[in-house]
Design a protein with these regions (language model features):
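Short, hydrophobic/glycine-enriched beta-strand segments
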Residues: 3-9
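Active-site-adjacent alpha-helix immediately C-terminal to a catalytic or transition-state-stabilizing loop
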Residues: 4, 62-63, 70-76, 150-167
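Long, compositionally biased
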Residues: 129-140
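Phosphate-coordination/substrate-recognition cap region in phosphate-metabolizing enzymes
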Residues: 38-131, 145
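Short acidic/His/Gly/Ser-rich catalytic and metal-binding motifs that mark active-site loops
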Residues: 12-17, 122-124, 133
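Short coil/turn segments at beta-strand junctions that form active-site/ligand-binding loops
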Residues: 2, 48-51, 166-167
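Loop-to-helix element that buttresses phosphate recognition and phosphoryl-transfer chemistry
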Residues: 11-67, 142-158
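Short glycine- and Lys/Arg-enriched binding-loop motifs that mark or flank ligand-binding interfaces
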Residues: 6, 18, 28, 87, ...
Length: 167
């Protein structure tokens, strides 16, 4: 029987600043690196052999995985990176402070954007100041400007079913 271990990336610079991150390719904080080390130590205590790793194309996720693998002394060459595992795209909210957005639009509206299954945040404008921070490894025809949780589900689940679950 195979095990599936899910680990969220460590704290990023924008997590710390309470900014919507989504597809913006933002680095880990030192605390985030420590969180990844701690996750690696917990996995090591379980004495589970890692055969395959999957990560998004976002450097905070890739760096978290690399830190974990270093703790495990695992020179795993079977690392699969895919933009299809990226976090949800927060559209126009990307890079904005969550508290400021709540003040501007109200807690109820922000919760609708964040928690509704089929409601997307406003789409990212072509002149958005964070446009250049969006992950670059996405085929142009697949690039979106916002995602609902449903959109994210419809992107991630087929990847899981085709690439991860068969292992």
């Amino acid at each position: 029987m195979n095990n599936l271990i899910l680990v969220r990336h460590g704290m990023s610079l924008w997590n710390k600043a309470k900014r919507f991150t989504g597809w913006a390719d933002i680095d880990l904080t030192e605390h985030g690196k420590s969180e990844a080390k701690y996750a690696g130590k917990l996995i090591k205590e379980l004495n589970i052999e890692i055969h395959s790793c999957f990560t998004s194309e976002l450097k905070r996720a890739i760096n978290s995985l690399n830190i974990i693998l270093k703790i495990l002394s695992n020179q795993n060459n079977n690392i699969n990176k895919s933009w299809k595992l990226n976090e949800r795209h927060y559209g126009e909210l990307t890079g904005l402070n969550k508290d400021e957005i709540i003040k501007k639009h109200g807690h109820k509206q922000v919760n609708i954007w964040r928690r509704s299954f089929d409601v997307s945040p406003p789409p990212m404008n072509t002149n958005h100041p964070c446009k250049n921070k969006i992950c670059k490894n996405i085929p142009k025809e697949k690039m979106v400007v916002t995602e609902s949780l449903k959109d994210t589900y419809e992107r991630v689940i087929p990847y899981y079913n085709n690439k991860i679950e068969p292992l």
